[in-house]
């Protein structure tokens, strides 16, 4: 099995990249691909860039040119579930766009035309993520809906919009729905596993930039455990 791993930013892939053996680097269309073996598994690690378009371009190349069998999306996310704290983990059961609106044509809020309303994560990969979490006894995890938009959600108004239209949302970020839609169109199994960098309606002693390295550590540990289970 060849495992594709996607992170948007350098900080989100650096820990994994440093652990790849036989590392080879390929750059194309603004995306950087790191190939080799990770914990004995054949992997392609993609640093896609931030946002949905960058993520879709990178995921397309990852699947079409690097022929990965599954896709794991790692990195940070903003928590919407009140039980979450900084460093906790979210696992996708489904992923939706929160910034798509073609409801004028009868679609659900967040549903892109001619696409399903939600992109469903692979059940086996969800189970693998949950098994991987057992090696991280200090981390709490929530599984559920992750919503994506080309928006850094930082205002009460945007938070309220998302809660109103997607009441079961557990976390938000800026790439997962594009990755999920691309995987859907290629019929490639995926799961999103991210660490919480901040939580809506909770005061944080750290800024996003300050916490990002800690979120990267948590999400990378989760991915490493998953890769070991999947190989």
From Swiss-Prot:
Transmembrane segments: none
Positions contributing to substrate binding: 78, 153, 174-175
Catalytic activities: S-adenosyl-L-homocysteine + H2O = S-(5-deoxy-D-ribos-5-yl)-L-homocysteine + adenine; S-methyl-5'-thioadenosine + H2O = 5-(methylsulfanyl)-D-ribose + adenine; 5'-deoxyadenosine + H2O = 5-deoxy-D-ribose + adenine
GO cellular component: cytosol
Entry superkingdom: Bacteria
GO molecular function terms listed in the Swiss-Prot or TrEMBL record: adenosylhomocysteine nucleosidase activity; methylthioadenosine nucleosidase activity
Pathway listed: Amino-acid biosynthesis; L-methionine biosynthesis via salvage pathway; S-methyl-5-thio-alpha-D-ribose 1-phosphate from S-methyl-5'-thioadenosine (hydrolase route): step 1/2
Major enzyme class: hydrolase
Keyword list, A-Z: Amino-acid biosynthesis, Hydrolase, Methionine biosynthesis
Pfam families in UniProt: PNP_UDP_1
Function: Catalyzes the irreversible cleavage of the glycosidic bond in both 5'-methylthioadenosine (MTA) and S-adenosylhomocysteine (SAH/AdoHcy) to adenine and the corresponding thioribose, 5'-methylthioribose and S-ribosylhomocysteine, respectively. Also cleaves 5'-deoxyadenosine, a toxic by-product of radical S-adenosylmethionine (SAM) enzymes, into 5-deoxyribose and adenine.
UniProt family annotation: Belongs to the PNP/UDP phosphorylase family. MtnN subfamily.
HAMAP family registered for this protein in UniProt: Salvage_MtnN
Protein name, UniProt field: 5'-methylthioadenosine/S-adenosylhomocysteine nucleosidase
Lineage: Bacteria, Pseudomonadati, Pseudomonadota, Gammaproteobacteria, Vibrionales
């Amino acid at each position: 099995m060849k495992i594709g791993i996607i992170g948007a930013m350098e900080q989100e892939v650096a820990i994994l990249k440093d652990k790849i053996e036989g590392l080879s680097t390929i750059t194309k269309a603004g995306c950087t691909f790191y190939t080799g073996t990770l914990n004995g598994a054949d992997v392609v690690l993609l640093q896609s860039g931030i946002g949905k378009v960058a993520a879709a371009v990178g995921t397309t190349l990852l699947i079409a040119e690097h022929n990965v069998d599954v896709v794991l999306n790692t990195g940070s996310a903003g928590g919407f579930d009140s039980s979450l704290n900084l460093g906790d983990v979210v696992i996708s059961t489904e992923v939706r766009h929160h910034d798509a609106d073609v409801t004028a044509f009868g679609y659900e809020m967040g549903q892109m035309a001619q696409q399903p309303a939600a992109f469903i994560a692979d059940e086996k990969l969800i189970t693998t993520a949950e098994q991987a979490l057992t090696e991280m006894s200090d981390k709490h995890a929530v599984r559920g809906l992750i919503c994506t938009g080309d928006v850094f959600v930082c205002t009460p108004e945007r938070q309220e919009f998302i809660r109103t239209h997607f009441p079961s949302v557990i976390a938000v970020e800026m790439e997962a729905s594009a990755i999920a839609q691309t995987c859907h169109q290629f019929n490639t199994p995926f799961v999103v596993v991210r660490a919480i960098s901040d939580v809506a309606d909770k005061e944080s002693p750290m800024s996003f930039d300050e916490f990002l390295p800690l979120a990267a550590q948590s999400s990378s540990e989760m991915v490493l455990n998953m890769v070991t289970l999947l190989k």
